[in-house]
Regions:
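Short, small-residue-biased leader/transition segments that mark boundaries at the very start
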Residues: 1-4
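Repeated loop/turn-to-beta-strand initiation elements of outer-membrane beta-barrel proteins
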Residues: 48-52, 141-143, 183-188, 241-245, ...
Length: 315
């Protein structure tokens, strides 16, 4: 059947750069982002529960940002210190001392500005695509399955002649979900997701780790690159009438602009509460944790974490 989706959001965000190392270093530049999206798809059953379809979509992302000027500020403090003035207190003094120790680099404090200057990408990016997909679905319930599998492979093409901001590029995604009842009230849910881009995408079209569904506990987009793979296992247990709890563990990788290395694997784990407000429809409250941040940066020393609240299961 036909599916239409449209979205428009205006929100504060952050950009850490592209690649695993950029995310690990923890330098972030604040953005005020305007995003709009429209997607349409049509599919038909080929055999039984196997479907094929076509899709199309338009994405727009605009970013407003300011440079921190940290390099000039550090140089200014250094000049004052050399003239006999004391190192200032507070955050600036701490960063100055870290800079002198080689543990802080003010030139990396504005990763979005650096990315735009280096790549020639535009802060306001328009992308349009056409695509094909195939899926196989034996789930008993789409939004809260207790048994069955879901497999979807989709290829999208973003040709330059459709008005794309960057050069022509392509994107392939693969989703594999498995659900199995265990004992009374218990379901084991497994998820595998892969995302690969060919060519040069716009800054907001890289595969992004984190968010509401996968690698919960990470800020979505802190780790982004041309290739991504994520997997998670979740145990869902109903405990009393409409109330339930869950626990999960997962792992993932981003690479592409940098080489794949097993040592760059990131972990995610957490727990959550479920309230069934309608039959097989849950309110979801999750708290997820990830890896620790850059211990050299005052704002990034804690373990990555996030509280999530929504009205559907993660997968």
């Amino acid at each position: 059947g036909d599916v239409y989706k449209r979205q428009f959001v205006y929100f504060p965000g952050a950009f850490y750069g592209v690649g695993y190392n950029a995310g690990k270093e923890g330098y972030a530049q604040d953005l005020t982002t305007t995003m709009g999206a429209f997607r349409i798809s049509y599919c038909t059953s080929l055999v039984g529960r196997f479907y094929i379809g076509v899709s199309g979509g338009i994405d727009y992302s605009g970013a407003k940002y300011k440079n921190s000027g940290m390099a000039d500020r550090m140089n200014g403090i250094q000049a004052d210190v050399e003239s006999g003035k004391p190192v200032p207190g507070g955050k600036m003094g701490e960063l100055y001392n870290l800079w002198q120790e080689g543990r802080y680099d003010p030139a990396k404090q504005d990763p979005f500005s650096n990315y735009i200057a280096t790549t020639g990408d535009k802060p306001n990016a328009f992308n349009a695509n056409v695509g094909l997909f195939a899926q196989y679905d034996t789930r008993d319930v789409t939004f809260n399955a207790s048994k069955g599998i879901f497999i979807k492979a989709e290829a999208k093409w973003y040709p330059e002649w459709l008005g794309n901001t960057r050069r022509t590029f392509g994107r392939f995604t693969l989703t594999f979900d498995f659900y199995q009842k265990l004992w009374k009230g218990a379901v084991l849910a497994c998820d595998l997701y892969a995302d690969a881009t060919t060519g040069t995408p716009s800054w907001h079209m890289y595969a992004k780790m984190g968010g509401m569904e996968r690698m919960r506990g990470y800020y979505e987009g802190r780790y982004r690159d041309k290739k991504l793979v994520e997997t998670q296992i979740e145990l869902r247990q109903k405990i009393y009438r409409r109330h339930g709890i869950v626990g999960w563990i997962g792992g993932g990788q981003v690479w592409g602009t940098e080489k794949f290395r097993w040592g760059n694997t990131l972990c995610s784990f957490g727990c959550g509460y479920r309230f069934e407000f309608k039959n097989r429809m849950n309110i979801r409250l999750d708290y997820g944790w990830g890896n620790f941040g850059n211990q050299n940066l005052p704002w990034d020393r804690k373990r990555s974490s996030a509280f999530l609240f929504t009205a559907s299961e993660a997968f």
